[in-house]
Amino acid sequence: MDHKLNLKKQFACIYTSDFFSGLRITDAVWVALLAARGFSLWEIGLAESVYHIVSLFCEVPSGMAADLLGRKKTLVSGGVCMVLQSLLMAFASDLFTICFAMGLNALAMTMFSGTTTALLYDSLKQEGCEEKYIQVSANGSQISMLANAVGSMASILNQFLGYAGFYLLNAAFGGISALANLLLAEPIVTESQASREKHPLHALPEQFRQLVRDSLHVLHTCPMAGKLIASSALISVPSYLTKMFLQQRLVELGWPTELLFLPLLLGGLACVAGTEVGRRVRCRSMRRLYSACALLCGVGTLLVGAAPAWGGILGMMLVQGVLEVYLLHESQKLNDAIPSDQRATLISVDGMAYSLLMIPASPLVGAVGDAFGQAGAGLALLGGAIMLSGVALLGKKPQRS
């Protein structure tokens, strides 16, 4: 393929998009904002359920769209959806609009999830420097995490911004991110990608069917890809749940809304530190790396569930940091194992596997907590399960990669 790419400009656009998309200033306070407007906990829970359902059903189709129609188009479309959902949330007055906006948010996130990774890896592959993926990916992750940590501090502006102000500022940041994606170049590494614009619309259904067949063939003939997908889905389950239940515990302990940014800020800094460790770790065996990371994630989850407030915050930080180490190397190995024409689709399968585990895990953790009368009981059980998954691999022969 004779296509040249300006990697310096490409990275600048990616990093700019990472920064402004990372400034999600509503993440730390969206539950509190809705509750303050009179929405009940079951209504807020319903909106969260809509988010996960849309994520589940749109994860793989969005990846397929990225592979067939182009990664740049998909990222820009996701940015538009993100702006629209913020505007809807800013002026929503009923549960239906809130749920619709949450669905748009989920759709946007599915468009970003596998597509961003695929575009970055193939940009490097086009220039023959895939070995730089971990370093470049780590840079983008750290920029996004630092932005997320800064954005979480917006909760201290609760009295000045108000409900609508949070989401209008969110929409502005999302718009800048979408503009940065608009300046990206579409990487071309295969003949199929080079001929995307030549395919008529009526050929799309057959292309989708062929993409499904090709993706299933890759999963069947490459067991390593399936193992990596399953491992990342399992070890990632505590990521959101530890943050969610920690926020709930801190509110119950009397923490004001203005201070809820603190655990998210510290969690973001832990992610940055974890990414820095991850880029310096030389992974000789994914099996050993998973075992070590699963044991540490399990310990962190146990701390969130059983320790006092600051012990819980430290546990959440441990979970977030360790996950970044594992997922950075898992992403590299998965990209190395799969072909470019199915890259976004198969990375989206990775995300779908996580959603499939989260749908039962979230209510189960809550139900265990209710049954024992202790909010942390469910997290303690989850932490034990994650630790057992790591122990189960310790006795097996490491697989070198």
Give the ranges of each region predicted by the language model:
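Hydrophobic core of transmembrane alpha-helices in multi-pass small-molecule transporters
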Residues: 19, 85, 96-112, 311-326
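Cytoplasmic helix-loop-helix junction between adjacent transmembrane helices
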Residues: 103-145
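Juxtamembrane intracellular "pre-TM" segments in multi-pass secondary transporters
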Residues: 1-8, 186-229
